[in-house]
């Protein structure tokens, strides 16, 4: 059985939710990984974390509209909704990632 995930429509992605999702260092690191790759197995986003912790953080990113999750067999593949974020909030993701890279 393939699991389906709820994702907000692009029009429903809000700045406060996106900023909240990006405010956590763990989720920010996940987004940095996703920004470099097309899709990542969810377990590769937090190999040293309990699965429940990875699930918690990926759920917050997905519900905020930052990521898209798709199920394929026993794996969950996560991808960054870059086009949605860049359209709704031009420059936001690049600024956040650049600021984090400067640390």
Model region roles, listed by residue range:
Residues 2-28:
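Short alpha-helical segments that sit at the start of domains
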Residues 11-15, 19, 36, 77-103:
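Conserved segment of winged-helix/HTH DNA-binding domains
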Residues 25-28, 35-41:
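Short capping segments at the starts of secondary-structure elements
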Residues 26, 53, 84:
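Two-component histidine kinase catalytic core, primarily the HATPase_c
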Residues 42-67:
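Canonical helix-turn-helix DNA-binding module
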Residues 63-73, 79:
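Beta-hairpin "wing" of winged helix-turn-helix
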């Amino acid at each position: 059985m393939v699991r389906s995930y709820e994702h907000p429509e692009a029009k429903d992605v809000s700045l406060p939710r996106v900023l909240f999702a990006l405010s956590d260092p763990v989720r920010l690191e996940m987004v940095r990984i996703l920004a470099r790759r097309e899709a990542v197995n969810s377990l590769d986003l937090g190999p040293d974390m309990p699965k429940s912790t990875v699930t918690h953080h990926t759920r917050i990113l997905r519900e905020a509209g930052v990521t898209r999750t798709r199920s394929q067999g026993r794996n969950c593949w996560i991808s960054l909704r870059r086009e949605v974020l860049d359209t709704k909030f031009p420059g936001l993701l690049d600024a956040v990632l650049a600021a984090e890279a400067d640390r």
